[in-house]
């Protein structure tokens, strides 16, 4: 509740994001039918502030009613950063993809901190925003006779390196060097 109260204070002060933004996926989809038990558990107990939150994001500058996505970097969303761009994103897979594939710079912080960054127009400079924070701590060499399954390989690497930065070598054997739709999909599933 304190988060929603803070959002109300920001709105009452007239603050909004300097640019339109997307947000993490919603936990509930109003267009999907639910049972009485689901309504009680999800709408009356777990997500009682959902409508309030959505209205607050509209007032703070969310792009559209359907701007809740974990793939905010896709062309159809209209939020694809360029290499070197500093981002204020909270969705973990989008942060990894932006850093690894697109060459943007972004930390994975809470949605609240990222919204504050969007309103302020800047974010704290630490971690993956710095050259030092982007240096790899692990060298991962992929040596397989066929293209590895993206989610399996990404999960295995992630479980080993945890919060460290890996440098993955060898995927170009199957992906080449062009960032086409097929490679984008593979790297998205890989978690890169």
Task: Mark where each language-model region is.
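Non-transmembrane, aqueous-exposed alpha-helical and coiled segments at domain scale
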Residues: 1-192
